[in-house]
């Protein structure tokens, strides 16, 4: 069978949900028994997002092979069975880097290197490489049609249609149909202009996903179809929903998968969406509520913690609970009234981050959770700060710190990875990707996983200093997870506590709605057991509120 491609583009404005659309289409095709690949092209000049500010880019999603990628790859993995690699996310910067390397090596034999054909060929070759193992490859093009940065990618997919034919390629365009309250009507002009822009570069969309807050009536669909040169069935209502996990069901109801398969000349079984439907049912009919306070450095932009939030949702759904998240600015907890800000939460979580800003506030939050027996979950920096707090306030090691925050600290509880000593480059130099971990029998971690050998994804430059292991474990801290060779400490716990666990890795990157991560499930369960009284909850299944912005 020839390789089949679905290209997902966006128009009018950014942040319309191209990534969720691609993931949802992948979910539906998998439910029909097809093997699905997904990839994203990002038009920025950074080689990868690893050194980009979370406030600009959002979360950096890490794959098993250690690639630092766009957060949309997290959606791809959560909605499908795909396990992605660095080949599934390419940027303009990385493509240009590859081309310049080839040019310096003499691969182009003296030719003038140009956007067409050299850049577009590199893009097409990347798509073919990913498509080699699968039935359908879904390719998301980052940015918005009309952006100068996206033009080489759009030209590449235009050429793919020419080379492979209509029966092997489908163009899905995500656009906006806004409701204008003053006029009390839906406006189609933004969509018409977006499609006109696509046509100007030689691409006729086959399917339009129209983002809107209500179902599109027949007359609106008919109007869009007429002016955008496609059949009315191909004008899809991409309606706003309270839970992102409802999107595949909305698309199935609108017939997106059937339409794409008809265009691709593919026959499949009927989709089995029973588990997905049951998941959405739990989203909207929780039996209780759990409140989690997340103490972070980048809480002003929730996309900085996209996978983290979703992993908590997965844990809550596994228990049939509504999740209420409160985002707490870590610096705000450096004030004397920090205990007042932290009271009332069923659980406290400190996620990853870099730099010393807000660390003292995190330490206050950890102390509060430890002393008041509030379930605590620390991830990456959250584990490191838990060790520092324990060293200071339980072991009495005054001035204990990380060399990242205080190079002159008398007690380096956390220090730079030994193999990174003398390394000055920032990009791609951390301990990245999947690493094995061995758990102690009888520990919280082993009980949660149900086994003692695991593999988790990492992204860090600093590690626990094992010179302090005897002091901390002698005072009651338990090291329950290490690398197989015992080089790195991966998990710490406090046994004399309802739930207190810190891990050096990022478990959120492997959590899925139908397969919640064991540590998030265990944490949410412990937090709910700490919740008094157990009140009935109402939809939606997850809410967010900020503190200290």
UniProtKB/Swiss-Prot annotation:
Region (Amidoligase domain): 1-266
GO terms classed as biological process: 'de novo' CTP biosynthetic process; pyrimidine nucleobase biosynthetic process
Binding-site list for ATP: 15-20, 72, 239-241
Coiled-coil region(s): none
Activity control note: Allosterically activated by GTP, when glutamine is the substrate; GTP has no effect on the reaction when ammonia is the substrate. The allosteric effector GTP functions by stabilizing the protein conformation that binds the tetrahedral intermediate(s) formed during glutamine hydrolysis. Inhibited by the product CTP, via allosteric rather than competitive inhibition.
Chain residues that bind L-glutamine: 353, 381-384, 404, 461
Residue numbers binding Mg(2+): 72, 140
Enzyme class: ligase
Binding positions for CTP per the UniProt entry: 14, 147-149, 187-192, 223
Involved pathway(s): Pyrimidine metabolism; CTP biosynthesis via de novo pathway; CTP from UDP: step 2/2
Catalytic function, reaction form: UTP + L-glutamine + ATP + H2O = CTP + L-glutamate + ADP + phosphate + 2 H(+); L-glutamine + H2O = L-glutamate + NH4(+); UTP + NH4(+) + ATP = CTP + ADP + phosphate + 2 H(+)
Family named by the database record: Belongs to the CTP synthase family.
Subunit structure: Homotetramer.
Note: CTPSs have evolved a hybrid strategy for distinguishing between UTP and CTP. The overlapping regions of the product feedback inhibitory and substrate sites recognize a common feature in both compounds, the triphosphate moiety. To differentiate isosteric substrate and product pyrimidine rings, an additional pocket far from the expected kinase/ligase catalytic site, specifically recognizes the cytosine and ribose portions of the product inhibitor.
Cross-referenced NCBIfam families: PRK05380.1, PyrG
Name of the protein in question: CTP synthase
Taxonomic placement: Bacteria, Pseudomonadati, Acidobacteriota, Terriglobia, Terriglobales
